[in-house]
């Protein structure tokens, strides 16, 4: 009973989805979304091998020859949407080799699903599977000729933010981590009781946390408590709480939650943080 997956109520509290009649419809508000083209970068849809399974992924890197730090960008519970692919391209434009795995391929993807089903699917996936998919993306990226395998950044949004913390705890090769509004008390069906607090002492990489002070699903007190917990064993920790910013404030394809000023400041901080630790 210690499992704390997202319930339907929590999904709706997060306000992280564009919906019509309660059905997830990524892209309905793309007219307002940021569009990053592929000038100067190479972007593609790929497949990753995870054990005996293949899952889709998306990667992008600068077009010019060179070796680039790796950034694994973990999506939220909407999966590998067009907006998330755009974020991957933004990292490439900033001089990184970025990759994002589709975490919900085995479950039939999230597009067109109603919120109760979305919550059920995300809760049914174990920590081991989630982290295995992220590991596959990181290993694939690090093996490419244009990658700097000794510079691995990880970042993620919503559920991907929580996975950013868990992956960093289990992966000593992570150089820097940037969780965006990741639930610090989220646990998994195969790991009851194992939330971010439980693994905080194992996170050795520098961490920049980007959270909204008006997030109805993640109390500011929890964020501050987790920051304090991390700082007990990690000297390179910084958390930012944006006033009046709700959950998913970076989602420019969702005008009901997007907060331009907070999103732009957080993006600048994210890039500066990765530049400091990954481009050194």
What are these regions (language model features)?
Residues 33-63:
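N-terminal cap/lid segment of alpha/beta-hydrolase-fold proteins
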């Amino acid at each position: 009973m210690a499992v704390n997956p997202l319930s339907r109520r929590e999904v709706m509290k997060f306000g992280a989805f564009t919906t019509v009649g309660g059905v997830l419809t990524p892209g309905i508000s793309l007219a307002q979304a940021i569009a990053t083209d592929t000038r100067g970068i190479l972007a593609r849809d790929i497949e990753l091998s995870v054990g005996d399974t293949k899952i889709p992924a998306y990667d992008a890197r600068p077009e010019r020859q060179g070796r680039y730090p790796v950034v694994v960008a973990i999506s939220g519970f909407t999966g590998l949407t067009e907006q998330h692919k755009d974020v991957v391209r933004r990292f490439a434009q900033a001089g990184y080799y970025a990759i994002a795995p589709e975490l919900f391929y085995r479950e039939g993807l999230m597009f067109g699903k109603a919120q109760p089903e979305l919550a059920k699917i995300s809760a049914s996936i174990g920590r081991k599977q989630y982290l295995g998919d992220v590991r596959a993306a990181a290993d694939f990226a690090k093996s490419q000729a244009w990658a700097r395998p000794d510079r691995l950044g990880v970042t993620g949004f919503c559920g991907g933010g929580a996975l950013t913390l868990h992956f960093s705890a289990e992966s000593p090769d992570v150089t820097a981590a940037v969780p965006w509004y990741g639930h610090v008390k989220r646990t998994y069906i195969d790991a009851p009781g194992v939330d971010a607090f439980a693994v905080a002492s194992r996170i050795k990489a520098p961490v920049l946390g980007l959270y909204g002070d008006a997030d109805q699903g993640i109390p500011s007190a929890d964020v501050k408590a987790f920051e304090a917990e991390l700082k007990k064993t990690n000297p390179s920790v910084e958390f930012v709480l944006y006033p009046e910013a709700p959950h998913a404030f970076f989602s420019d394809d969702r005008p009901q939650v997007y907060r331009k000023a907070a999103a732009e400041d957080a993006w600048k901080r994210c890039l500066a943080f990765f530049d400091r630790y990954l481009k050194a």
